[in-house]
Swiss-Prot record:
UniProt-recorded name of the protein: Large ribosomal subunit protein bL20
Organism: Teredinibacter turnerae (strain ATCC 39867 / T7901)
Higher taxonomy: Bacteria, Pseudomonadati, Pseudomonadota, Gammaproteobacteria, Cellvibrionales
Keyword field: Ribonucleoprotein, Ribosomal protein, RNA-binding, rRNA-binding
Keyword Signal part of the UniProt annotation: no
InterPro entries: Ribosomal_bL20, RIBOSOMAL_L20_CS, Ribosomal_protein_bL20_C
Length: 119
């Protein structure tokens, strides 16, 4: 079997990793062995946090909705129950946006939820 000289392939592979590690601190951006580990770990963090981001935003939306709905005299859980009963299908992202930027519209939605719970 012929000998395989890896010069070009190895150089390309190293360049790819070092380019991905650009901006990292110290040896993590300069030494291939360390940079490779850093890039792999960064990928793991990115994968994990793309999922956590969804949870964090949902929690933020719920906090905002709860704060505004309490100002309107209703707890978050009662509001969601009222919306389900009134068959209003607005997701939490939209509700949170209304709670922050369009308080009169949010107040109208809370009023409808209250009516649905009273009925």
């Amino acid at each position: 079997m012929a000998r395989v000289k890896r010069g070009v392939v190895a150089r390309r592979s190293h360049k790819k990793v070092l380019k991905a590690a650009k901006g990292y601190y110290g040896a993590r951006s300069r030494v291939f062995r360390v940079a490779k580990q850093a890039v792999i770990k960064a990928g793991q963090y990115a994968y994990r946090d793309r999922r956590n981001k969804k949870r964090n935003f949902r929690a933020l939306w719920i906090t905002r909705i709860n704060a505004q709905s309490r100002a309107e005299g209703m707890s978050y859980s009662r509001l969601i129950a009222g919306l389900k009963k009134a068959e209003i299908t607005l997701d939490r992202r939209v509700l949170a946006d209304l709670a922050i930027h369009d308080k009169p519209a949010f107040a109208a939605i809370v009023a409808k939820a209250k009516d649905a719970l009273a009925a």
